[in-house]
Amino acid sequence: MKIMFISLGCDKNLVDSEVMLGLLRDRGHMLTNDENEAEVIVINTCSFIHDAREESVETILEMAKLKENGKCRLLIVGGCLAEKYKDEIFKEIPEVDAVLGTTAYDRICQVIDEATEGKRPMAFESIDRLPKGHVRRVITTGGYFSYLKIAEGCDKHCTYCIIPKLRGSYRSVPLEDILTDARELAAAGVKELNIVAQETTMWGKDIYGEKRFPMLLKKLCQVEGIEWIRILYCYPEEITDELIQVMAEEPKICHYLDLPIQHGSDAILKRMGRRTSRKELEEIIGKLRTAMPDIALRTTLITGFPGETEKDHEELMDFVEKMDFDRLGVFTYSPEEGTPAQKMEGQIPEEQKEERRDDLMALQQGISEENSRKMIGRTLQVLVEGRIPEEDVYVGRTYRDAPDVDGYIFLGA
């Protein structure tokens, strides 16, 4: 059968989609990117915030039309939206033939078989399950970079976050499975590994009784063919001196860190259930910059959190200005059903959230422009990813640019 995948949401979800594609390829199915040719359409959904849920539902409804107007015979929904709203999906969207949860993606072949027989399967496993066995996945990112997922789930339980309920507790992928994945990616021509998980720096704690992320990084640096290793999703309180030392000493590890801090006001950090104070964040960032003066730091913030006063917003603006982040993204707070923050007093109007977000982005724009000017005259290695024929230029990234979220370098032909 011809099967098409639509992967929504984060890069961790994309890795799950690539694993499912690998299973289907090994089963003999044909893969296609043409929705008008697909006999089976699988949508791997996101449900992290309200906007993500809307996008997921809109995509399902759009693809459902192809059961009447195209060749589509089966419409299958997986991922976080399916995990949370499986009954509602079946009830409200009768065109959906099967749903599978976040820890049951390795059952995709079975689900398609059952749906082909006219059943309407619901494939779900324990939320704390980690699918076993390695699968050679299908690379969908273009060939030169890929995401390497090293863990599933999260134990942090921030007051605004639904992820532990959708993805379960923290489970590390075994070392040999990670290394096998990395070697296969390298053999396929991948030059850059982007390390992802809900939280990367906790890796190994559930296997060894202690964090072993620095050890894992050293092992990955030994994989032949890999030139860059980029670390994403690092919780600041888990950054140790050992990790900083490994980053500084290993030439393959990019001097780049994705460090989600969420806020700069101690009062809001406490309400969020975060585990670092503003002072501690400043100390951690100071250590990173002392060890690696050329490090590029990316962070994400949430504005409009319940109880956020004008003073809290000003403290966050001051923090952003002083920390001089190279890359920064801002989300307006999205109340999630079943989280403590949803029930907190002091909910902020949407208009005010957006105004505060715009303040932060305007501030960061000036910081980013100044940091870009500082790069003039420097010589940097660029990973060239493609060419724009009509403009006769090549497109690539430096160590300072993570795929999908940061900028690009344009090179004259």
Model-derived features with residue positions:
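Terminal RNA-binding accessory module
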Residues: 343-413
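Conserved, mostly hydrophobic/aromatic
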Residues: 178, 195, 231, 259, ...
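Proteins enriched for Cys/Gly/acidic motifs involved in redox and nucleic-acid/cofactor modification
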Residues: 1-203, 242, 257, 280-290, ...
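Short flexible coil/turn linkers enriched for glycine and charged/polar residues
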Residues: 140-144, 154-156, 253, 263, ...
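Contiguous mid-protein beta-loop-alpha structural module that forms a pocket-lining wall or clamp
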Residues: 308, 322-325
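Conserved SAM/AdoMet-binding glycine-rich loop
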Residues: 75-76, 84, 89, 187-310
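Short glycine-enriched, charge-decorated loop/helix-capping segments at active-site entrances
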Residues: 47-48, 167-168, 207-210, 270-276, ...
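Short, hinge-like loop/turn segments at secondary-structure boundaries
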Residues: 93-94, 115-118, 211-213, 247-248, ...
